[in-house]
Amino acid sequence: MGRGKIEIKRIENSSNRQVTYSKRRNGIMKKAKEISVLCDAHVSVIIFASSGKMHEFCSPSTTLVDMLDHYHKLSGKRLWDPKHEHLDNEINRVKKENDSMQIELRHLKGEDITTLNYKELMVLEDALENGTSALKNKQMEFVRMMRKHNEMVEEENQSLQFKLRQMHLDPMNDNVMESQAVYDHHHHQNIADYEAQMPFAFRVQPMQPNLQERF
């Protein structure tokens, strides 16, 4: 006696629904692996549970991205909106430019030039000559800047030396220094004379700093 036909509808009991999902999911994954091996087919399966958890299978000989790209080409259906397609094209363009620049850089270093033809070698030679010329111009500009800087420093040094010589030769400076010396001498002499005239009782002794501060 065979099993009764199961009605296909949503299982209300959450526990039973989870058990059924696990069994059916494992069955689908098993069938996908079998057809992939037995028939050498490219198979990809993606399952999202009601909880949001994802399970997937893809044939070992391919990837999901390759299969989606193949599907896009064969079906003609848009899997991505124009904005994402433009971004993908821009990424590919930048990658190609980067690869091209890496090749040019190796050529400028003298690497991988055996495969270049005569015209490509001439272009490479022109690029090297232009680069060498620009480098020499930059070096000459730097040398000129250094010379100008050294000249300015030398002029400033000479100006300072001239001012120092003028200060030594100017008699006014000697007069000022002499007058200051005479003033200091008379000032100290006056103080000494004043202290000599003070009574002994009013003189501040060196060993009494407190009294000296008050005086």
From Swiss-Prot:
Gene of this entry: GLO
Name recorded for this polypeptide: Floral homeotic protein GLOBOSA
Domain K-box: 84-170
Listed GO CC annotations: nucleus
Membrane-spanning residues: none
Function: Transcription factor involved in the genetic control of flower development. Acts in conjunction with DEFICIENS (defA).
A Pfam family this chain is assigned to: K-box
Organism: Antirrhinum majus
CDD domains, A to Z: MADS_MEF2_like
Extra remark: Mutations in Glo cause transformation of petals into sepals and stamina into carpels.
Domain MADS-box: 3-57
Superkingdom in the source lineage: Eukaryota
A Gene Ontology molecular function term of the record: DNA-binding transcription factor activity
PROSITE patterns to which the protein is assigned, alphabetical: K_BOX (PS51297), MADS_BOX_1 (PS00350), MADS_BOX_2 (PS50066)
Localization: Nucleus
Keywords of the record: Activator, Developmental protein, DNA-binding, Nucleus, Transcription, Transcription regulation
InterPro entries tied to this protein: MADS-box/MEF2_TF, MEF2-like_N, TF_Kbox, TF_MADSbox, TF_MADSbox_sf
SUPFAM superfamilies assigned: SRF-like
GO biological process, alphabetically ordered: positive regulation of transcription by RNA polymerase II
Database matches in Gene3D superfamilies: Transcription factor, MADS-box
